[in-house]
């Protein structure tokens, strides 16, 4: 199989991923688990108290795979974000269905952590039209959103997770950032 490069943007920075096959993309959770577990412990619980009991509500993670809808773009490097979400959803038994916010969407639990998966059905450069309102609806701060997209600047054959960085001049992630700040979700 051809090598595929991708970036996963989130938590105030950029996580860059490179995967060599669809099977490896299916193991996305394994690669992200240490990062998410660390962030999960410090930022993900909201305490609810009442006179008789208290409980914690675990805030979900939103994983977004950027790509372009339509057969014309299937199996192209530009849709690696879609491929990553598809493989992750399949490996975790999460079904994706149409969502009112212009996305294919799924919800599930992975190792006790709630996850939301989204594939915006807008063109990539307009992905913020889907992701911004979706994150706002679920009241997710930006540090609970990870966005996977192709990255032509990444060399093939390298895997790098980086909690801080930029968006790699990627218009889809720029649109996402602008929409999120306009929705005041951070």
Curated annotation (Swiss-Prot):
Gene Ontology MF terms in the entry: peptidyl-tRNA hydrolase activity; tRNA binding
Annotated site location: Stabilizes the basic form of H active site to accept a proton: 150
UniProt keyword annotation of Transmembrane helix present: no
Subcellular location: Plastid, Chloroplast
Chief localization: plastid
Active-site residues (renumbered): 78
Gene3D superfamilies: Peptidyl-tRNA hydrolase
UniProt transit peptide range: 1-49
The keyword Isomerase belongs to this UniProt entry's keyword annotation: no
Pfam families listed in its UniProt record: Pept_tRNA_hydro
InterPro entries hit by this protein: Pept_tRNA_hydro, Pept_tRNA_hydro_CS, Pept_tRNA_hydro_sf
Binding site for tRNA: 73, 123, 125, 171
Keywords of this entry: Chloroplast, Plastid, RNA-binding, Transit peptide, tRNA-binding
GO CC field: chloroplast
Family: Belongs to the PTH family.
Descriptive protein name: CRS2-like protein, chloroplastic
Organism encoding this protein: Oryza sativa subsp. japonica
């Amino acid at each position: 199989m051809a090598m595929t490069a991708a970036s996963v943007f989130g938590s105030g920075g950029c996580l860059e991923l490179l995967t060599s096959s669809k099977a490896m993309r299916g193991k996305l959770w394994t690669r992200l688990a240490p990062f998410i577990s660390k962030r999960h412990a410090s930022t993900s619980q909201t305490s609810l108290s009442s006179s008789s009991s208290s409980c914690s509500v675990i805030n979900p993670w939103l994983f977004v795979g950027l790509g372009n809808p339509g057969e014309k773009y299937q199996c192209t490097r530009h849709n690696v974000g879609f491929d990553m979400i598809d493989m992750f959803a399949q490996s975790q038994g999460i079904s994706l269905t149409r969502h009112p916010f212009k996305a294919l969407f799924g919800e599930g639990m992975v190792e006790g952590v709630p996850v939301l998966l989204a594939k915006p059905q807008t063109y990539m450069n307009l992905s913020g039209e889907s992701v911004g309102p979706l994150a706002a609806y679920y009241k997710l701060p930006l540090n609970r959103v990870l966005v996977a997209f192709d990255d032509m600047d990444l060399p093939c054959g390298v895997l790098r997770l980086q909690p801080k960085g930029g968006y790699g001049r990627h218009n889809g992630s720029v649109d996402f950032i602008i929409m999120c700040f306009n929705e005041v979700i951070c």
